[in-house]
A protein has these predicted regions:
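Short S/T/G/P-rich N-terminal loop/turn motif that feeds into the first structured element of a domain
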Residues: 1-39, 43-45, 49-54, 93-135
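Short hydrophobic/aromatic beta-strand micro-patches
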Residues: 13, 58-62
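Short linear sequence elements within intrinsically disordered, low-complexity coil regions
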Residues: 19, 60, 68, 77-78, ...
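An amphipathic, aromatic/His-enriched active-site/gating alpha helix that lines ligand/cofactor pockets
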Residues: 62-95
Length: 135
């Protein structure tokens, strides 16, 4: 899917100065942020204020790739009004199930490394086949 856009969950925490200005002069800051999103190749799908929890704003934004999402993150953080921000790739349930299937096919048995100076850990032996006798 070369032209598909990836969805990202964006969580934003304003700093105290930004909140002070928003309380004194309420405004929709997304009017200022939308052009930044667009210059990074994205478009806002949904945005909401969050009044409980660690973040103040949650948004779903589509970007062409992770580099565009990273550029958006850097641009916003450089602006000075945000003290913390998370940008996380979202996947649909269907995509997640495909990934789970891939992980199941690729899994291996993990055994921790041996401490220095000790004998290497023994790998689990495959069970003997039924009907085969040991001598």
């Amino acid at each position: 899917m070369p032209n598909a856009k990836l969805r990202f969950l964006v969580l934003v925490k304003y700093n105290g100065d930004a909140w002070r200005k928003l309380v004194d002069y309420p405004e929709d800051r997304w009017k200022a942020v939308r052009p930044v999103v667009a210059r990074c190749g994205g478009n806002v799908i949904r945005k909401d204020l969050v009044f409980q929890g660690d973040y103040d704003l949650a948004a779903t934004i589509k970007f062409p790739d992770a580099e565009c999402a990273a550029a958006f993150y850097m641009a916003v953080m450089a602006g000075g009004a945000v003290s913390d921000m998370k940008v996380m790739r979202l996947v649909s349930i269907e995509e997640g199930m495909r990934v789970m299937g891939m992980a199941g096919a690729a899994k291996y048995s993990f055994f921790p490394p041996s401490p220095p100076g000790s004998r290497p850990a023994k790998r689990a032996q495959a069970p003997e086949r039924a009907g085969r006798r040991r001598r």
